[in-house]
Amino acid sequence: MITIEQVLEVLKKDHNFRDIINQEYYYYSWTGVTFDHLSYDSRDITPSTLFFAKGAGFKLEFLESAVQAGLGFYVAEKDYQVGIPAILVSDIKQAMSLVAQAFYQHPQDKLKLLAFTGTKGKTTASYFAFNILKQSHKPAMLSTMNTTLDGKTFFKSNLTTPESLDLFRMMAEAVSNGMTHLIMEVSSQAYLTKRVYGLTFDVGVFLNISPDHIGPIEHPTFEDYFYHKRLLLKNSQAVIVNSGMNHFDFVAEEVADKDHDFYGKDSENTVKHSSGFSFKAKGKLAGDYDIQLIGDFNQDNAMAAGLACLRLGASLEDIKKGIAQTSVPGRMEILTQANGAKVFVDYAHNGDSLDKLLQVVTDHQKGKISLILGAPGNKGESRRQDFGHVLNTYPEINVILSTDDPNKEDPLTICQEIASHINRKVRIIIDREEAIKTAMSETTGSSDALVIAGKGADAFQIVNGKRTDYAGDIEVAKKYL
Protein backbone atom coordinates (compact mmCIF):
# COMPACT_ATOMS: atom_id res chain seq x y z
CA MET A 1 0.00 0.00 0.00
CA ILE A 2 1.01 3.59 -0.49
CA THR A 3 -0.58 6.91 0.46
CA ILE A 4 -1.02 9.77 -1.95
CA GLU A 5 1.29 11.82 0.26
CA GLN A 6 4.03 9.22 -0.27
CA VAL A 7 3.41 9.20 -4.03
CA LEU A 8 3.75 12.97 -4.23
CA GLU A 9 6.88 12.93 -2.07
CA VAL A 10 8.54 10.44 -4.46
CA LEU A 11 7.61 12.50 -7.52
CA LYS A 12 8.70 15.81 -6.00
CA LYS A 13 12.03 14.40 -4.86
CA ASP A 14 12.68 13.32 -8.47
CA HIS A 15 11.65 16.79 -9.71
CA ASN A 16 9.00 15.04 -11.80
CA PHE A 17 5.84 16.40 -10.18
CA ARG A 18 3.96 19.15 -12.00
CA ASP A 19 0.58 19.46 -10.28
CA ILE A 20 -2.68 17.75 -9.46
CA ILE A 21 -5.54 18.99 -11.58
CA ASN A 22 -9.19 18.32 -10.79
CA GLN A 23 -12.07 20.06 -12.54
CA GLU A 24 -9.71 22.87 -13.66
CA TYR A 25 -8.47 23.48 -10.10
CA TYR A 26 -4.76 23.00 -9.34
CA TYR A 27 -3.37 21.39 -6.19
CA TYR A 28 0.18 21.04 -4.91
CA SER A 29 -0.79 18.49 -2.26
CA TRP A 30 -3.57 16.03 -1.43
CA THR A 31 -4.38 13.95 1.62
CA GLY A 32 -6.58 11.13 2.79
CA VAL A 33 -6.16 8.67 -0.09
CA THR A 34 -4.47 5.25 0.03
CA PHE A 35 -3.74 3.00 -2.94
CA ASP A 36 -3.46 -0.78 -2.65
CA HIS A 37 -2.86 -1.53 -6.33
CA LEU A 38 -0.80 -0.10 -9.20
CA SER A 39 -1.74 -0.66 -12.84
CA TYR A 40 -1.06 0.50 -16.40
CA ASP A 41 -3.78 -1.79 -17.80
CA SER A 42 -7.24 -0.20 -17.88
CA ARG A 43 -8.77 -3.69 -17.59
CA ASP A 44 -7.04 -4.22 -14.23
CA ILE A 45 -8.74 -1.63 -12.05
CA THR A 46 -10.24 -1.35 -8.56
CA PRO A 47 -11.45 1.82 -6.80
CA SER A 48 -8.19 1.92 -4.80
CA THR A 49 -5.91 1.58 -7.86
CA LEU A 50 -3.38 4.21 -8.89
CA PHE A 51 -3.43 4.06 -12.67
CA PHE A 52 -0.61 5.13 -15.00
CA ALA A 53 -1.66 6.40 -18.44
CA LYS A 54 1.41 5.52 -20.48
CA GLY A 55 2.53 4.68 -23.99
CA ALA A 56 2.32 6.20 -27.45
CA GLY A 57 -0.72 4.04 -28.17
CA PHE A 58 -2.66 5.11 -25.07
CA LYS A 59 -6.23 6.12 -25.88
CA LEU A 60 -8.78 8.20 -24.01
CA GLU A 61 -11.30 5.36 -24.07
CA PHE A 62 -8.91 3.23 -21.98
CA LEU A 63 -9.06 5.79 -19.20
CA GLU A 64 -12.80 6.28 -19.57
CA SER A 65 -13.39 2.54 -19.10
CA ALA A 66 -11.16 2.59 -16.01
CA VAL A 67 -13.21 5.46 -14.54
CA GLN A 68 -16.38 3.46 -15.17
CA ALA A 69 -14.76 0.61 -13.20
CA GLY A 70 -14.35 2.93 -10.21
CA LEU A 71 -10.92 4.48 -10.75
CA GLY A 72 -10.37 7.54 -8.56
CA PHE A 73 -6.86 8.80 -9.47
CA TYR A 74 -4.44 8.51 -12.36
CA VAL A 75 -0.91 9.62 -13.22
CA ALA A 76 -0.26 11.05 -16.68
CA GLU A 77 1.71 13.59 -18.67
CA LYS A 78 -1.49 15.47 -19.57
CA ASP A 79 -4.99 16.03 -18.20
CA TYR A 80 -7.44 13.75 -20.02
CA GLN A 81 -10.42 15.54 -18.40
CA VAL A 82 -12.34 12.44 -17.36
CA GLY A 83 -13.82 13.85 -14.16
CA ILE A 84 -11.30 12.50 -11.64
CA PRO A 85 -8.08 14.03 -10.27
CA ALA A 86 -4.96 13.70 -12.44
CA ILE A 87 -1.46 13.67 -10.98
CA LEU A 88 0.54 15.30 -13.77
CA VAL A 89 4.22 14.51 -14.27
CA SER A 90 6.87 15.41 -16.81
CA ASP A 91 7.94 11.78 -17.38
CA ILE A 92 5.40 9.00 -16.84
CA LYS A 93 8.01 6.24 -17.17
CA GLN A 94 10.23 7.66 -14.44
CA ALA A 95 7.17 8.08 -12.26
CA MET A 96 6.14 4.44 -12.72
CA SER A 97 9.52 3.10 -11.70
CA LEU A 98 9.99 5.21 -8.58
CA VAL A 99 6.40 4.87 -7.35
CA ALA A 100 6.59 1.09 -7.87
CA GLN A 101 9.78 0.93 -5.81
CA ALA A 102 8.11 2.79 -2.96
CA PHE A 103 4.85 0.82 -3.23
CA TYR A 104 6.67 -2.52 -2.94
CA GLN A 105 8.92 -1.19 -0.14
CA HIS A 106 12.14 -1.15 -2.16
CA PRO A 107 12.57 -4.91 -2.67
CA GLN A 108 15.80 -4.31 -4.61
CA ASP A 109 17.49 -3.42 -1.32
CA LYS A 110 16.75 -6.92 0.00
CA LEU A 111 18.36 -8.79 -2.92
CA LYS A 112 21.79 -8.99 -4.52
CA LEU A 113 21.19 -7.81 -8.08
CA LEU A 114 23.09 -9.14 -11.11
CA ALA A 115 22.30 -7.82 -14.59
CA PHE A 116 23.51 -8.85 -18.04
CA THR A 117 23.38 -6.72 -21.16
CA GLY A 118 24.72 -7.30 -24.67
CA THR A 119 23.51 -7.89 -28.19
CA LYS A 120 23.65 -11.64 -27.70
CA GLY A 121 24.27 -14.12 -24.91
CA LYS A 122 22.20 -12.49 -22.16
CA THR A 123 19.93 -15.49 -21.65
CA THR A 124 22.76 -18.04 -21.74
CA ALA A 125 24.86 -16.01 -19.29
CA SER A 126 21.83 -15.62 -17.01
CA TYR A 127 21.29 -19.38 -16.95
CA PHE A 128 24.96 -19.94 -16.12
CA ALA A 129 24.66 -17.45 -13.25
CA PHE A 130 21.43 -19.02 -11.99
CA ASN A 131 22.96 -22.50 -11.88
CA ILE A 132 26.12 -21.18 -10.22
CA LEU A 133 24.32 -19.21 -7.52
CA LYS A 134 21.80 -21.94 -6.72
CA GLN A 135 24.67 -24.14 -5.46
CA SER A 136 24.91 -22.12 -2.23
CA HIS A 137 22.29 -19.36 -2.48
CA LYS A 138 18.65 -18.82 -3.47
CA PRO A 139 18.51 -16.98 -6.80
CA ALA A 140 15.48 -15.75 -8.72
CA MET A 141 15.83 -15.01 -12.43
CA LEU A 142 14.14 -12.77 -15.00
CA SER A 143 15.23 -13.80 -18.50
CA THR A 144 13.96 -13.54 -22.05
CA MET A 145 13.27 -17.27 -22.00
CA ASN A 146 11.87 -18.01 -18.55
CA THR A 147 11.27 -16.34 -15.21
CA THR A 148 11.46 -17.91 -11.76
CA LEU A 149 10.67 -16.08 -8.54
CA ASP A 150 11.16 -19.04 -6.21
CA GLY A 151 14.06 -20.83 -7.92
CA LYS A 152 11.85 -23.81 -8.74
CA THR A 153 8.77 -22.79 -10.74
CA PHE A 154 9.42 -21.31 -14.19
CA PHE A 155 7.04 -19.39 -16.45
CA LYS A 156 7.40 -17.77 -19.85
CA SER A 157 8.49 -14.15 -20.07
CA ASN A 158 6.79 -11.51 -22.22
CA LEU A 159 9.60 -8.95 -22.27
CA THR A 160 13.38 -9.23 -21.82
CA THR A 161 13.05 -6.71 -18.98
CA PRO A 162 9.53 -6.37 -17.50
CA GLU A 163 7.66 -3.08 -17.24
CA SER A 164 8.64 -1.33 -14.01
CA LEU A 165 5.35 -2.02 -12.20
CA ASP A 166 5.75 -5.72 -12.98
CA LEU A 167 9.49 -5.71 -12.26
CA PHE A 168 9.22 -4.44 -8.70
CA ARG A 169 6.17 -6.63 -8.01
CA MET A 170 8.25 -9.63 -9.11
CA MET A 171 11.16 -8.51 -6.94
CA ALA A 172 8.84 -8.24 -3.94
CA GLU A 173 7.51 -11.73 -4.62
CA ALA A 174 11.07 -13.07 -4.84
CA VAL A 175 11.85 -11.48 -1.47
CA SER A 176 8.71 -13.00 0.08
CA ASN A 177 9.81 -16.38 -1.31
CA GLY A 178 13.10 -16.10 0.58
CA MET A 179 15.29 -15.46 -2.45
CA THR A 180 18.72 -13.92 -1.82
CA HIS A 181 19.78 -12.96 -5.36
CA LEU A 182 18.09 -11.78 -8.54
CA ILE A 183 19.56 -12.32 -12.01
CA MET A 184 18.19 -10.11 -14.77
CA GLU A 185 18.62 -9.48 -18.45
CA VAL A 186 18.58 -5.73 -19.01
CA SER A 187 17.89 -4.70 -22.59
CA SER A 188 18.71 -1.38 -24.19
CA GLN A 189 14.93 -0.92 -24.47
CA ALA A 190 14.70 -1.17 -20.68
CA TYR A 191 16.82 1.97 -20.39
CA LEU A 192 15.22 3.66 -23.39
CA THR A 193 11.80 3.21 -21.78
CA LYS A 194 13.12 3.74 -18.22
CA ARG A 195 11.83 0.42 -16.88
CA VAL A 196 14.85 0.25 -14.55
CA TYR A 197 15.01 3.97 -13.75
CA GLY A 198 16.47 4.59 -10.30
CA LEU A 199 17.75 1.03 -9.93
CA THR A 200 21.37 0.25 -9.00
CA PHE A 201 22.78 -3.23 -9.62
CA ASP A 202 25.43 -4.89 -7.47
CA VAL A 203 27.12 -6.28 -10.60
CA GLY A 204 26.49 -5.35 -14.23
CA VAL A 205 27.93 -7.40 -17.10
CA PHE A 206 28.46 -6.12 -20.66
CA LEU A 207 28.83 -9.18 -22.91
CA ASN A 208 29.20 -7.68 -26.40
CA ILE A 209 27.84 -5.12 -28.86
CA SER A 210 26.98 -5.24 -32.54
CA PRO A 211 24.36 -3.44 -34.67
CA ASP A 212 20.84 -4.63 -33.78
CA HIS A 213 17.47 -3.26 -32.67
CA ILE A 214 17.89 -0.31 -35.02
CA GLY A 215 14.64 0.80 -36.60
CA PRO A 216 11.70 3.21 -36.41
CA ILE A 217 10.26 1.85 -33.14
CA GLU A 218 13.55 0.91 -31.48
CA HIS A 219 16.86 2.81 -31.67
CA PRO A 220 17.31 5.36 -34.47
CA THR A 221 21.08 4.80 -34.71
CA PHE A 222 23.81 2.45 -33.50
CA GLU A 223 25.17 5.26 -31.32
CA ASP A 224 21.83 5.48 -29.52
CA TYR A 225 21.72 1.69 -29.09
CA PHE A 226 25.31 1.59 -27.76
CA TYR A 227 24.65 4.48 -25.37
CA HIS A 228 21.59 2.82 -23.84
CA LYS A 229 23.48 -0.47 -23.46
CA ARG A 230 26.21 1.34 -21.52
CA LEU A 231 23.75 2.81 -19.04
CA LEU A 232 23.91 -0.51 -17.18
CA LEU A 233 27.57 0.18 -16.44
CA LYS A 234 26.75 3.62 -15.05
CA ASN A 235 24.12 2.08 -12.80
CA SER A 236 26.16 -0.84 -11.41
CA GLN A 237 28.47 -0.83 -8.40
CA ALA A 238 30.88 -3.28 -10.08
CA VAL A 239 31.13 -4.24 -13.73
CA ILE A 240 32.35 -7.17 -15.83
CA VAL A 241 33.28 -6.39 -19.46
CA ASN A 242 34.28 -8.57 -22.42
CA SER A 243 37.70 -7.38 -23.59
CA GLY A 244 37.06 -8.93 -27.00
CA MET A 245 33.95 -6.88 -27.72
CA ASN A 246 33.66 -4.14 -30.31
CA HIS A 247 34.52 -0.68 -28.93
CA PHE A 248 36.17 -2.23 -25.86
CA ASP A 249 38.77 0.55 -25.54
CA PHE A 250 36.00 3.11 -25.17
CA VAL A 251 34.13 1.02 -22.59
CA ALA A 252 37.33 0.25 -20.66
CA GLU A 253 38.04 3.97 -20.35
CA GLU A 254 34.46 4.61 -19.26
CA VAL A 255 34.64 2.07 -16.41
CA ALA A 256 38.24 2.75 -15.37
CA ASP A 257 37.16 4.34 -12.08
CA LYS A 258 34.71 1.56 -11.24
CA ASP A 259 35.37 -1.76 -9.54
CA HIS A 260 35.72 -4.04 -12.57
CA ASP A 261 36.94 -7.27 -14.14
CA PHE A 262 37.70 -7.85 -17.80
CA TYR A 263 37.49 -11.27 -19.44
CA GLY A 264 38.24 -12.70 -22.87
CA LYS A 265 40.78 -11.69 -25.47
CA ASP A 266 44.07 -10.28 -24.09
CA SER A 267 42.75 -10.12 -20.52
CA GLU A 268 43.82 -11.77 -17.29
CA ASN A 269 40.62 -13.84 -17.20
CA THR A 270 40.39 -15.95 -20.32
CA VAL A 271 39.99 -19.44 -21.73
CA LYS A 272 43.45 -20.95 -22.02
CA HIS A 273 42.49 -24.18 -23.78
CA SER A 274 39.21 -25.40 -25.26
CA SER A 275 38.05 -28.76 -26.59
CA GLY A 276 34.33 -28.96 -27.33
CA PHE A 277 32.66 -29.82 -24.04
CA SER A 278 35.46 -28.70 -21.72
CA PHE A 279 37.82 -25.78 -21.26
CA LYS A 280 40.65 -24.58 -19.04
CA ALA A 281 40.49 -21.05 -17.63
CA LYS A 282 43.19 -18.80 -16.24
CA GLY A 283 42.92 -15.78 -13.99
CA LYS A 284 40.44 -15.49 -11.12
CA LEU A 285 38.56 -18.56 -12.41
CA ALA A 286 41.66 -20.69 -13.03
CA GLY A 287 40.80 -24.36 -13.39
CA ASP A 288 39.25 -27.05 -15.57
CA TYR A 289 35.58 -26.82 -16.54
CA ASP A 290 33.00 -29.09 -18.15
CA ILE A 291 30.35 -27.39 -20.29
CA GLN A 292 27.30 -28.67 -22.15
CA LEU A 293 27.06 -25.74 -24.57
CA ILE A 294 29.64 -25.91 -27.36
CA GLY A 295 31.25 -22.87 -28.91
CA ASP A 296 33.81 -20.29 -27.80
CA PHE A 297 31.08 -17.70 -27.24
CA ASN A 298 29.34 -19.97 -24.72
CA GLN A 299 32.62 -20.41 -22.85
CA ASP A 300 32.94 -16.62 -22.79
CA ASN A 301 29.40 -16.37 -21.39
CA ALA A 302 30.35 -18.90 -18.71
CA MET A 303 33.44 -16.86 -17.80
CA ALA A 304 31.35 -13.68 -17.54
CA ALA A 305 28.80 -15.35 -15.29
CA GLY A 306 31.52 -16.94 -13.17
CA LEU A 307 33.32 -13.65 -12.56
CA ALA A 308 30.06 -11.92 -11.68
CA CYS A 309 28.99 -14.66 -9.28
CA LEU A 310 32.43 -14.69 -7.65
CA ARG A 311 31.67 -11.11 -6.59
CA LEU A 312 28.28 -12.20 -5.22
CA GLY A 313 29.46 -14.93 -2.88
CA ALA A 314 29.93 -17.97 -5.12
CA SER A 315 32.95 -20.23 -4.64
CA LEU A 316 35.06 -21.65 -7.47
CA GLU A 317 33.47 -25.03 -6.74
CA ASP A 318 30.00 -23.48 -7.11
CA ILE A 319 31.09 -21.96 -10.43
CA LYS A 320 32.43 -25.26 -11.78
CA LYS A 321 29.30 -27.18 -10.79
CA GLY A 322 26.96 -24.50 -12.10
CA ILE A 323 28.65 -24.24 -15.49
CA ALA A 324 28.64 -28.03 -15.90
CA GLN A 325 24.91 -28.23 -15.09
CA THR A 326 23.76 -25.48 -17.45
CA SER A 327 21.66 -26.05 -20.53
CA VAL A 328 19.38 -23.43 -22.06
CA PRO A 329 16.08 -24.05 -23.87
CA GLY A 330 16.48 -23.04 -27.52
CA ARG A 331 20.22 -22.38 -27.26
CA MET A 332 22.36 -24.86 -29.18
CA GLU A 333 19.88 -27.68 -28.66
CA ILE A 334 21.05 -30.66 -30.71
CA LEU A 335 18.96 -33.50 -32.11
CA THR A 336 20.27 -36.51 -34.04
CA GLN A 337 18.35 -37.95 -36.98
CA ALA A 338 18.13 -41.70 -37.60
CA ASN A 339 20.79 -41.35 -40.30
CA GLY A 340 23.14 -39.61 -37.86
CA ALA A 341 22.67 -36.10 -39.25
CA LYS A 342 22.52 -33.33 -36.64
CA VAL A 343 19.80 -30.73 -36.15
CA PHE A 344 20.84 -27.56 -34.30
CA VAL A 345 18.05 -25.38 -32.89
CA ASP A 346 19.20 -21.96 -31.73
CA TYR A 347 17.76 -18.55 -30.97
CA ALA A 348 20.40 -16.76 -33.10
CA HIS A 349 18.38 -13.79 -34.32
CA ASN A 350 20.86 -11.20 -35.56
CA GLY A 351 23.85 -11.18 -37.87
CA ASP A 352 26.52 -11.55 -35.21
CA SER A 353 24.86 -14.41 -33.32
CA LEU A 354 24.10 -16.20 -36.61
CA ASP A 355 27.75 -15.92 -37.62
CA LYS A 356 28.91 -17.36 -34.28
CA LEU A 357 26.40 -20.20 -34.57
CA LEU A 358 27.45 -21.11 -38.11
CA GLN A 359 31.13 -21.04 -37.10
CA VAL A 360 30.45 -23.68 -34.43
CA VAL A 361 28.33 -25.88 -36.69
CA THR A 362 30.76 -25.79 -39.62
CA ASP A 363 33.64 -26.61 -37.27
CA HIS A 364 31.87 -29.76 -36.06
CA GLN A 365 29.94 -30.91 -39.14
CA LYS A 366 31.89 -31.28 -42.39
CA GLY A 367 29.11 -32.50 -44.69
CA LYS A 368 26.18 -30.69 -46.27
CA ILE A 369 24.88 -27.84 -44.09
CA SER A 370 21.38 -26.38 -44.46
CA LEU A 371 19.91 -23.36 -42.68
CA ILE A 372 16.33 -22.29 -42.01
CA LEU A 373 16.08 -18.60 -41.21
CA GLY A 374 13.62 -15.72 -41.13
CA ALA A 375 13.34 -12.28 -39.58
CA PRO A 376 10.66 -10.69 -37.40
CA GLY A 377 8.28 -8.10 -38.75
CA ASN A 378 8.06 -4.49 -37.60
CA LYS A 379 11.34 -4.54 -35.66
CA GLY A 380 15.09 -4.77 -36.19
CA GLU A 381 14.84 -4.25 -39.95
CA SER A 382 18.64 -3.91 -40.16
CA ARG A 383 18.94 -7.63 -39.36
CA ARG A 384 17.71 -8.58 -42.82
CA GLN A 385 20.70 -7.01 -44.52
CA ASP A 386 23.01 -8.32 -41.79
CA PHE A 387 21.80 -11.89 -42.38
CA GLY A 388 22.59 -11.53 -46.08
CA HIS A 389 26.10 -10.28 -45.41
CA VAL A 390 26.79 -13.18 -43.02
CA LEU A 391 25.43 -15.81 -45.39
CA ASN A 392 27.58 -14.47 -48.22
CA THR A 393 30.60 -15.59 -46.17
CA TYR A 394 29.21 -19.15 -46.04
CA PRO A 395 28.57 -19.84 -49.75
CA GLU A 396 28.42 -23.61 -49.18
CA ILE A 397 25.37 -23.41 -46.90
CA ASN A 398 21.98 -24.24 -48.40
CA VAL A 399 19.55 -21.51 -47.27
CA ILE A 400 15.78 -21.84 -46.84
CA LEU A 401 14.01 -18.63 -45.80
CA SER A 402 10.81 -18.99 -43.80
CA THR A 403 8.43 -17.30 -41.37
CA ASP A 404 9.68 -15.90 -38.05
CA ASP A 405 7.19 -13.69 -36.16
CA PRO A 406 6.06 -11.61 -39.17
CA ASN A 407 3.70 -9.55 -37.03
CA LYS A 408 1.97 -7.04 -39.34
CA GLU A 409 4.30 -7.57 -42.30
CA ASP A 410 3.96 -10.09 -45.12
CA PRO A 411 6.38 -12.98 -44.37
CA LEU A 412 7.04 -13.42 -48.09
CA THR A 413 8.12 -9.78 -48.37
CA ILE A 414 10.45 -10.21 -45.38
CA CYS A 415 12.02 -13.33 -46.92
CA GLN A 416 12.43 -11.60 -50.27
CA GLU A 417 14.18 -8.68 -48.57
CA ILE A 418 16.65 -11.05 -46.86
CA ALA A 419 17.17 -12.86 -50.17
CA SER A 420 17.96 -9.57 -51.92
CA HIS A 421 21.10 -9.30 -49.78
CA ILE A 422 22.30 -12.87 -50.53
CA ASN A 423 24.42 -13.26 -53.65
CA ARG A 424 23.22 -16.77 -54.55
CA LYS A 425 19.94 -18.54 -55.09
CA VAL A 426 17.95 -19.44 -51.97
CA ARG A 427 14.61 -21.12 -51.41
CA ILE A 428 11.59 -19.59 -49.71
CA ILE A 429 9.16 -21.91 -47.89
CA ILE A 430 6.76 -19.74 -45.91
CA ASP A 431 5.29 -22.54 -43.78
CA ARG A 432 8.00 -23.05 -41.14
CA GLU A 433 7.04 -26.65 -40.37
CA GLU A 434 7.10 -27.51 -44.07
CA ALA A 435 10.53 -25.85 -44.33
CA ILE A 436 11.86 -27.98 -41.45
CA LYS A 437 10.36 -31.17 -42.88
CA THR A 438 11.86 -30.45 -46.31
CA ALA A 439 15.31 -29.61 -44.98
CA MET A 440 15.46 -32.67 -42.72
CA SER A 441 14.59 -34.92 -45.66
CA GLU A 442 17.67 -33.58 -47.45
CA THR A 443 20.22 -34.31 -44.70
CA THR A 444 21.38 -37.82 -45.47
CA GLY A 445 24.59 -38.57 -43.56
CA SER A 446 26.17 -38.27 -40.13
CA SER A 447 28.38 -35.39 -41.26
CA ASP A 448 25.39 -33.35 -42.49
CA ALA A 449 23.55 -30.78 -40.39
CA LEU A 450 20.46 -28.61 -40.37
CA VAL A 451 20.52 -25.32 -38.48
CA ILE A 452 17.12 -23.90 -37.49
CA ALA A 453 17.77 -20.35 -36.35
CA GLY A 454 15.80 -17.47 -34.91
CA LYS A 455 13.01 -18.80 -32.72
CA GLY A 456 14.84 -21.08 -30.31
CA ALA A 457 12.34 -22.42 -27.79
CA ASP A 458 9.54 -20.00 -28.74
CA ALA A 459 6.40 -22.09 -29.23
CA PHE A 460 4.42 -19.42 -31.09
CA GLN A 461 4.43 -17.13 -34.10
CA ILE A 462 3.59 -13.44 -33.69
CA VAL A 463 1.05 -12.48 -36.36
CA ASN A 464 -0.79 -9.14 -36.38
CA GLY A 465 0.38 -8.34 -32.87
CA LYS A 466 -0.81 -11.62 -31.34
CA ARG A 467 0.82 -14.94 -30.49
CA THR A 468 -0.54 -17.68 -32.73
CA ASP A 469 -0.16 -21.44 -32.35
CA TYR A 470 3.14 -22.97 -33.42
CA ALA A 471 4.58 -26.13 -31.87
CA GLY A 472 8.12 -24.73 -31.76
CA ASP A 473 11.20 -25.62 -33.80
CA ILE A 474 12.45 -28.34 -31.46
CA GLU A 475 9.07 -30.10 -31.31
CA VAL A 476 8.56 -29.86 -35.07
CA ALA A 477 12.04 -31.26 -35.71
CA LYS A 478 11.38 -34.19 -33.35
CA LYS A 479 8.40 -35.19 -35.52
CA TYR A 480 10.71 -35.84 -38.48
CA LEU A 481 13.75 -37.43 -36.82
UniProtKB/Swiss-Prot annotation:
GO cellular component entries: cytoplasm
Short motif L-lysine recognition motif, span: 404-407
Main location, first listed in the record: cytoplasm
Documented EC number(s): 6.3.2.7
Post-translational modification: Carboxylation is probably crucial for Mg(2+) binding and, consequently, for the gamma-phosphate positioning of ATP.
Sequence positions that bind ATP: G118, T119, K120, G121, K122, T123, T124
Top-level lineage group: Bacteria
Protein name: UDP-N-acetylmuramoyl-L-alanyl-D-glutamate--L-lysine ligase
Organism this protein belongs to: Streptococcus thermophilus (strain ATCC BAA-491 / LMD-9)
